[in-house]
């Protein structure tokens, strides 16, 4: 493989027509965005509808320094608008009513839609907004959504935005416990789900999971009043021979069918004009303490940032067909399946299936079928598909592709080069995007026509984003070096707070280095100024792009009656990027056996979700702890990869435990 110094210039055909067509042009706009952010973003704002315009003197106000008062970020204070109006009504009025907003591709290739136009999408959103109003949902109410990747999902989100309700989407791979915890935290008034869905050859009965979650949330002391259910299973192809549908559990006066509720509703609904800083949505992300954090995004700034990053990073032009494979249950789906594309009048594919069903060429067949021009997926998927070689790719015509995106975790150079060579045929730009639930949109990314690409590097900051590298003492690292990745000024799309917990927001992101937003990630800057994300610097795990905390997994493991203590670390995985390696100390007189391992894997799967299931569970008679009782995780990470260079262990209470843990490494870890 080429050394990291290898640079791949953008295809001149892409640069020629790109919004940002050279690195010099990028640098010019970037400097403007830092020197005068209010002027830069007010130009962007002119393309959108504002019921009340912004006061230029109040365009940006912020405090990042906790020692100077509460952390506060405000963009366009005093302005009012409605996000749904800007995404749908504005585009219809601008002549895009008959343009396709979404093609839907189901789990089975026989299930697909011929396309939902902007006009039809607006009508459906208004109908469902009227359904929500009839069920008592008003501005500021929280609505939880737990759905598969079907067209009703963006319709539900936009209906919430239209009436000023705050949506809280929970990825439909999360367990009922996780759903209940999130509904309880946000005090949801209503839940929207589907009876079920197919994932590959496996049926998922979502309504049954929701019923379990609704019972749990009731036990916690909160009642979710209504549940609206999409009848999805009957309209799609079963993916198992002789499949018999399970009965859908139902509670009268609480549960309502979506199609029945929509029947008599008006296809018009006046939008609720929202203040610029009114909440738009909240999305839970894992916290290092184990309790999920309700990241809150607001109206105006998020609109500006989602729209601009989508347009510039994917270089989207009228007539292009864009496909992001992310589930809308994650921030990538919010910003780059729904809000960003629709703000630009784009045509997108929404995909319900998996990369491997019915064959391992499914992604390439979808790209061919819809003539996709921009494709955005995760390194995990790319690495999994690399295993099948070039054969499945060659069966399909991918010649329409112009931009290939990567998201969720750093992409290793081998996967980058395979993506570039076999999917992009060395003609496409690869945008390796770094960002977080908290940032709202891309913060470090190449631009397709402007940035010479280095395999594995996220490259340079987006407009308005000012990254800094700090050492452990908070001293800035200039030039080449590696440290904590922080940002010193706000961009419009960044989170404003954690729902109902501003103190935790300040403590998590602003207390370690006063004056800076701390990402929790490390980064390295090379001699050319390129940034390379080195991974989490806190106790977080990134498995197949799913961020979770060690505390979250450990708390499940230690609930088992035979377990005294547990510690979880990540270790590299060729497909998932990272996998979970768990150390388990059984209770006194308990045996560590295969049944315990199976039980623990099952518990994690059920309590958190299938993506969190540990790859390795090791017997640990004791854990490497300092004399103050703190687990030395860096030692456990070394044991997980069988690296005996563990460094200084003199502060350990019992140094002999390290050798014992090396000796105990299970066969599957070797």
Swiss-Prot record:
Task: Tell me the protein's name.
Answer: Acetyl-coenzyme A synthetase
Q: Which PANTHER family match?
A: ACETYL-COENZYME A SYNTHETASE (PTHR24095:SF244)
Q: What the protein does?
A: Activates acetate so that it can be used for lipid synthesis or for energy generation.
Tell me the compartments it is located in.
Cytoplasm
Q: Gene3D superfamilies recorded for this chain? A: 3.30.300.30, N-terminal domain of ligase-like (3.40.50.12780)
Q: Which InterPro entries match?
A: Ac_CoA_lig, ACAS_N, AMP-bd_C, AMP-bd_C_sf, AMP-binding_CS, AMP-dep_synth/lig_dom, ANL_N_sf
- Catalytic activity of the protein: acetate + ATP + CoA = acetyl-CoA + AMP + diphosphate
Q: Output the Gene Ontology terms for molecular function.
A: acetate-CoA ligase activity; AMP binding; ATP binding
Q: Which SUPFAM superfamilies match?
A: Acetyl-CoA synthetase-like (SSF56801)
What is the species of this protein? Answer: Drosophila melanogaster (Fruit fly)
Q: Name one GO cellular component term.
A: cytoplasm
Superkingdom of source: Eukaryota
């Amino acid at each position: 493989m080429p050394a990291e110094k290898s640079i791949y210039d953008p295809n001149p055909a892409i640069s020629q027509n790109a919004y940002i067509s050279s690195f010099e042009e990028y640098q010019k706009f970037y400097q403007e965005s830092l020197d005068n952010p209010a002027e830069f973003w007010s130009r962007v704002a002119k393309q959108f509808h504002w019921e009340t315009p912004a006061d230029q003197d109040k365009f940006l106000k912020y405090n990042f320094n906790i020692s100077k008062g509460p952390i506060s970020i405000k963009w366009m204070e005093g302005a009012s608008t409605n996000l749904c109006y800007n995404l749908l009504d504005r585009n219809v009025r601008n002549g895009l009513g008959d343009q396709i907003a979404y093609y839907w591709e189901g789990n089975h290739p026989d299930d697909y839609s011929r396309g939902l136009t902007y006009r039809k999408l607006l009508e459906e959103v208004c109908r469902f907004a009227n359904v929500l109003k009839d069920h008592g949902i008003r501005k500021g109410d929280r609505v939880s959504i737990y759905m598969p990747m079907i067209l009703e999902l963006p319709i539900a989100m936009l209906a919430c935005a239209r009436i000023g309700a705050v949506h809280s989407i929970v990825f439909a791979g999360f367990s009922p416990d996780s759903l209940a915890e999130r509904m309880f935290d946000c005090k949801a008034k209503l839940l929207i789900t589907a009876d079920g869905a197919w994932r590959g050859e496996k049926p998922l009965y979502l309504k049954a999971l929701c019923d379990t979650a609704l019972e749990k949330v009731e036990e916690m002391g909160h009642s979710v009043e209504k549940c609206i259910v999409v009848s999805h299973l009957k309209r799609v192809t079963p993916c198992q021979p002789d499949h018999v549908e399970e009965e859908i559990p139902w509670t009268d006066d609480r549960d309502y069918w979506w199609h029945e509720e929509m029947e008599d509703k008006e296809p018009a609904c006046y939008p609720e004009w929202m203040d610029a800083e009114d909440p738009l949505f909240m999305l839970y992300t894992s916290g290092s303490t184990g309790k999920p954090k309700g990241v809150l995004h607001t109206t105006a700034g998020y609109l500006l940032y989602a729209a601009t990053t989508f347009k510039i990073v994917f270089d989207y032009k009228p007539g292009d067909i864009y496909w992001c494979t992310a589930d809308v249950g994650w921030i990538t789906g919010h910003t780059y399946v729904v809000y960003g594309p629709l703000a630009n009048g784009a045509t997108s594919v929404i995909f319900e299936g998996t990369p491997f069903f019915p064959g391992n060429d499914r992604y390439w067949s979808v790209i061919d079928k819809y003539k996709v021009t921009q494709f955005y997926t995760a390194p995990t998927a790319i690495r999994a598909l690399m295993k099948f070689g070039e054969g499945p790719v060659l069966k399909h015509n991918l010649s329409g592709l112009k931009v290939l995106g990567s998201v969720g975790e750093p992409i290793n150079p081998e996967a980058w080069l395979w993506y570039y060579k076999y999917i992009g045929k060395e003609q496409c730009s690869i945008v390796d995007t770094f960002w977080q639930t908290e940032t709202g949109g891309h913060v470090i990314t190449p631009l397709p026509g402007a940035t010479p690409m280095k395999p594995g590097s996220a490259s340079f900051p987006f407009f308005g984003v000012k990254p800094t590298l700090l050492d452990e003492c908070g001293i800035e690292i200039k030039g080449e070096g590696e440290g904590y990745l922080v940002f010193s000024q706000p961009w419009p799309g960044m989170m404003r707070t954690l729902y109902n917990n501003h103190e935790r927001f300040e403590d998590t992101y602003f207390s370690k280095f006063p004056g800076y937003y701390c990402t929790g990630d490390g980064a390295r800057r090379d001699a050319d100024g390129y940034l390379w994300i080195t991974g989490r610097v806190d106790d977080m795990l990134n498995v197949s792009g799913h961020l979770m905390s060690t505390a979250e997994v450990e708390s499940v493991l230690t609930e088992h009656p035979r377990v005294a203590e547990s510690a979880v670390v990540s270790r590299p995985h060729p497909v998932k990027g990272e996998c979970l390696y768990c150390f388990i100390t059984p209770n006194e007189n308990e045996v560590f056996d295969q049944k315990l391992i199976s039980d623990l894997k099952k518990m994690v799967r059920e309590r958190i979700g299938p993506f969190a299931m540990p790859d390795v569970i090791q017997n640990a008679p004791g854990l490497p702890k300092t004399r103050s009782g703190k687990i030395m995780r860096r030692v456990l990470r070394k044991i997980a990869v069988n690296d005996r260079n563990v460094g200084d262990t003199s502060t350990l209470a019992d140094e002999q435990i390290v050798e014992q843990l090396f000796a105990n490494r299970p066969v599957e870890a070797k």
